[in-house]
Amino acid sequence: MSGMHFERMAAAYAAARPPYPDVVFETLEAEGVIGPDIRVLEIGAGSGLATRELVARGSDVVALEPGPQLAALLHDAGAGVEVLPSRLEDAQLADADFDSVVAATAMHWVDLSVGLPKIHRALRPGGWLAVWRNVFGDDRVQTPFRRRVDEIVAKRPHAEHGRGRDQRPTMGELAADGWFEPVRTARWRWSIDLSAAQIGDLFRTFSNWTTGEAAAAEAAASDLGGQVTEHYQSVLHLLRRAPRAT
C-alpha cells in the first residue's frame, strides 16, 4: 500500500474499512487461486484486511507492505504470513516462486509497466493474478446521503467526475501488454449500515478526502438520522500468467 496517508492512518484504516464480502474469497478458493498449500504473494497488504482471509483458507502468504505501522499490524494476521517491507516495484522476488499473486484495493498504486512483468516472473507457469477492490458507492443506487456526498465533492476546486481511479486498473489495462490472459471479471453489489461516526472514520481513510470533507460527510449522516445504508461494489479481475509476453 503506497502513500504516507495510509501509514499515518494505520490503526484507523484497520478499524474503519469494511471487510470484503465472503463471496470474493469463496470465488478465489473455488478457482484454486487460494487455499491449502497454495503459495500466494499479496501486493500492498495494508493492515491485513484480505490477508487474514487468505491465511484462514490455508494459503501460504508472503505479504508486501512498505509502511512500518501497517506491516506491524500484518504480523497479527496469523501464522504462515511472511511480511516483506517493500513495494512491489522494489521487491526482490525469486523467479517462479508463487502459485498466485493477489492485490486487494492496492493495484491502482502499482506502476504496471514495472509491476506486471515482475509478477509474471514471480509466478509459476499457469499461475493466477487476482486483482480486486471495494468501490465505495454504487452509481445505480442514489440515496440522500450519496447526494450529500456528491455536493461535498462538487465544492472541490477541481471537481471529480465519475468513479475514475476507483475502477482502476481495468481488465484491459492488466492484460494490455500480454503478460496475462483474462479469465473473467466478477462484480458483486452489497450494502452495509454505518453510523455517522463510522462514516467519519471511514471517509478519513480515503486519501483523496480532506479532514474537513470527512467531517462534512459525518455531519450529513448525522443530519439524516445518525445511520445510513451505503451501497458498495466489489470488483474482481482474474487472469492467468501468459506463456510469454507478446
Enumerate the language-model features and the residues they cover:
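Conserved catalytic/acceptor-binding region of the Class I
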Residues: H120-W190
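Class I SAM-dependent methyltransferase SAM/SAH-binding core
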Residues: R39, S47-A91
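Conserved class I S-adenosyl-L-methionine
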Residues: M1-G35
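Conserved beta-strand/loop positions that form the S-adenosyl-L-methionine
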Residues: I43
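Conserved Class I S-adenosyl-L-methionine
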Residues: R168-T246
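Short catalytic micro-motifs in class I SAM-dependent methyltransferases
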Residues: T105
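A short, conserved alpha-helix within the catalytic core of class I
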Residues: W109-I119
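A short acidic, Gly/Pro-enriched loop at the edge of an enzyme's catalytic core
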Residues: A91-V101
